[in-house]
Each structure stands twice: as C-alpha cells, then as structure tokens.
Curated annotation (Swiss-Prot):
Residues forming coiled coils: none
Subunit structure: Forms a 24-polypeptide structural core with octahedral symmetry.
Gene Ontology cellular component terms for the protein in this record: pyruvate dehydrogenase complex
Main function: The pyruvate dehydrogenase complex catalyzes the overall conversion of pyruvate to acetyl-CoA and CO(2). It contains multiple copies of three enzymatic components: pyruvate dehydrogenase (E1), dihydrolipoamide acetyltransferase (E2) and lipoamide dehydrogenase (E3).
Protein's UniProt name: Dihydrolipoyllysine-residue acetyltransferase component of pyruvate dehydrogenase complex
Domain Lipoyl-binding: 2-78
Keywords: Acyltransferase, Lipoyl, Transferase
EC numbers for this chain: 2.3.1.12
Cofactor remark from the record: Binds 1 lipoyl cofactor covalently.
Species of origin: Rickettsia conorii (strain ATCC VR-613 / Malish 7)
Pfam families linked: 2-oxoacid_dh (PF00198), Biotin_lipoyl (PF00364), E3_binding (PF02817)
Domain Peripheral subunit-binding (PSBD) positions: 132-169
Keyword Acyltransferase: yes
Catalytic reaction(s) noted: N(6)-[(R)-dihydrolipoyl]-L-lysyl-[protein] + acetyl-CoA = N(6)-[(R)-S(8)-acetyldihydrolipoyl]-L-lysyl-[protein] + CoA
Length: 412
C-alpha cells in the first residue's frame, strides 16, 4: 500500500514552509533515517528524513515550491510491484494541495520598463510673434535659460512678470523617459528567510519605541587575558577564545546583575526571563540568523567559546534546529570585525534589547590627569522603552563595562 510523505512541522509555530530541494528522485530506493529533502523555514534550511522504507514513487510537490502547508502531501512511497494506477488513485484521494512553485511573478520582467508605455504629450501653442514681459522678468529668464514661449504670463494681457519666472518649472510632459538596459541589473527572488527578516524588522521599527544608549569600554586587560588563554591552549585550536566570546559572557553576567533588562513586552504583562539565553547575530549567505547560547551565565569562557563555534558552523551550513535559533531574551550584533565604530541595531521582537558592538581601536584618553593610549570599544544598546527604562538600560551598560574592563570578574 502506498505511504504518504507529509510536509513536516519543524517547530510548534510553523504553519507552512518552502520545499527547497529533493535529494532523491522518483524511482529511488529510500531507507528509514535517510535524508530525502530540504525544507526552508523562516530562519534555516532543515533536512527531512524518511520514516519508512520503500520506493519514491511520486514527487507531488516539486522542489523550489513556496508556502507549502504543514501536513500536506509532498510525495508518495510505494512497495515493490505496486501499479502506477494505484499510486495515481492514492494521490488523487489524499492530495488536496496544489504545489506553489517559486516564481518571479511579482518581480518586474527584464524587458518590461516604463519606456514601453506610450508617451502622451500635450503641446501648448503660444502666439510667439510678440511676447510681453517686464524688464526684470527678461533678465531673470536669461539668467535661468528659460524660453518665454514656455511661460504663461499672469500680468495684464498675459504679460510675463518676475513671479512667473520665479515659479516656472519645466513641464514633465516634455521630459523624455529614459529606460534602463535590462543587462544593467539582475533579479534575485527573495527567499523565505529574506522575507521574514524584512517583515519582522519593518514591524520592529514601526511598532517598537526604540531608544539608544552608548558607552565606551577599555579592552586592554581583556585582550591581555585573551592572549594568555590562547597561548596556554595554543596546541588546541578548538579552544581559541575570541573577543566576541568575552562579550557574550560579559552580557550574560550583566543580565544576571540587571535582570530587568532580560525581558520582553506583552500586551497584558511584561515577561521577565529566569534564564539568560543570548541570541548572537550570524551573517549567512541568505541573510541573518541568531543562534542562541542558552544559560550563558552558567558557562565558563571555554564552554561558551566551544558552543558558539559549533553554533556558527551549523548556521553557516544551514543546519540549525528550531530549538537553536528560536527564543532568546537578548541579542548581540557585532560588526567590529568590519571596522564599524558604532551603530544602532534594530530590536528583534519580542526581545526588548539588542546591543551593537563596534570595532576596538587605539585612542587617546585621560587617566589620572595624564593623556595615555588605550584600546577602546564602543557599544550601543537599542532598547524597547515599553519594557526598559533609561535608568535600567544605563545600569546594564555600566555592569557590562565593569565585566569587560575587569575580565577576571567573569572568570572566577
């Protein structure tokens, strides 16, 4: 008897997804646990494993199909010897969803441009045998290279006056529409991840009252400790500590001290989190994902570093599970490696805070009334004012600065 392969729900909130790719073709033998397809969710590409054994008799939903509802029929397995008519009858009985192949229908076609629209021009004819204009209007027209034939006078008997020249704008009807050569650009359809990013960040900027606080941190001691740790573990590359690892740990410790910054907004109540779960923004080919370091405040720097490396690798390979990127109470976005000094990040709802981290650089500072050189890192907190008041945001940044500038406090 034919066996249904259904669109899986990869998270409790998932209602539909994109069937990105089939890894098996019709007629192939399929074993339990074997990866047969890839499903694109709003944050990652997930593998679909076969549960049953059989022959992949029919692919109902082709690859590159969008918005496939959960639990809809995407393929059929059959046993040896089953007839094609039986398979077709089984599909007709069980399939109520039509595939939605990915298309560029909403994108402009390369050869469609506004130059193809018939140009309609209204020509206004004037009697130019004699033009009446004031001397000042004539001087202004000459200075501005304006032809009197194009100007309608508002003075007595149509006389052109100063104000007519000052208020004159060329008719748009005579401006030739310039078309772009379709070879000057390329069209890339928006994948599901990009659409979700656009939707969520637009919603955030439109509905969340952002405010921003910045602070400077001296990272000289942190860099010294990092160098000592990496020298000690020089033979084991997997334990190499990054500055970002220290930043994550410092945020975790600061949230432990200022728990009111570890919260999210709800219409009826503010949710304060007991766990310190930190989302870390990671750039991938298709956009951005935020894998989560859970209970970050309970981990030492080596544990946190190893876990972060594993999460980044899975993110780059599109192998994150929903549990690894859904949730989190606070986000870190670090653009320091690109030389960015500071920036205001957009809050990732329903979280109430995101911290943008800039590059470390040598600067002149005043210490004990003396000018000296220090390595300074700028960080900017974007906070939801419905949840986090200015004083709470300031307390958090002060606590973060304390741990960054005295890193030994994070290690004991």
């Amino acid at each position: 008897m034919p066996i249904k392969i259904l669109m899986p729900a990869l998270s409790p909130t998932m209602t539909e997804g994109n069937l990105a790719r089939w890894l098996k073709k019709e007629g192939d033998k399929v074993n339990p646990g074997e990866v047969i397809a890839e499903i694109e969710t709003d944050k990652a590409t997930m593998e679909v494993e076969a549960v049953d054994e059989g022959i992949l008799a029919k692919i109902v939903i082709p690859q590159n199909s969008q918005n496939v509802p959960v639990n809809s029929l995407i393929a059929v397995l059959s046993e040896e010897g089953e007839e094609k008519t039986d398979i077709d009858a089984f599909i007709a009985k069980n399939n109520s969803v039509s595939p939605s192949p990915k298309t560029d229908a909403n994108l402009p076609k390369p050869h469609e441009n506004i130059a193809n629209v018939e140009e309609q021009v209204t020509v206004i004819k004037h009697d130019v045998s004699r033009i009446f204009a004031s001397p000042l209007a004539k001087r202004l027209a000459k200075m501005r290279n304006i032809r009197f034939e194009s100007v309608k006078g508002s003075g007595p008997h149509g006389r052109i006056v100063k104000q007519d020249i000052l208020s004159y704008t060329p008719s748009t009807a005579h401006n030739k529409i310039v078309s772009r050569n379709p070879e000057e650009y390329r069209l890339v359809p928006n994948n599901n991840i990009r659409k979700i990013i656009a939707k969520r960040l637009l919603e955030s900027k439109q509905t969340v009252p952002h405010f921003y606080l910045s602070i400077e941190c001296n990272v000289d001691k942190l860099l010294d400790i990092r160098e000592d740790i990496n020298k000690f573990f020089s033979e084991d590359k997997s334990t190499r500590i990054s500055v970002n690892d220290f930043i994550i740990l410092a945020v975790a410790k600061a949230l432990q001290e200022v728990p009111n910054a570890n919260a999210s907004w709800g219409e009826d109540a503010i949710r304060y989190y007991n766990n310190v779960d930190i989302s870390v923004a990671v750039a991938i080919e298709n956009g951005l994902v935020t894998p989560i370091v859970k209970n970050a405040n309970q981990k030492n720097i080596l544990e946190l570093s190893r876990e972060m490396k594993a999460l980044i690798k899975k993110a780059k390979d599109n192998k994150l599970t929903p549990e690894e990127f859904q949730g989190g109470g606070f986000t870190i976005s670090n653009l320091g490696m690109y030389g960015i000094k500071n920036f205001n990040a957009i809050i990732n709802p329903p979280q109430s805070c995101i911290m943008g981290v800039g590059a470390s650089a040598k600067r002149a500072i005043v210490k004990n009334d003396q000018i000296t050189i220090a390595t300074i890192m700028d960080v900017t907190l974007s906070a939801d004012h419905r949840v986090v008041d200015g004083a709470v945001g300031a307390e958090f940044l002060v606590a973060f600065k304390k741990f960054i500038e005295s890193p030994v406090l994070m290690l004991i």
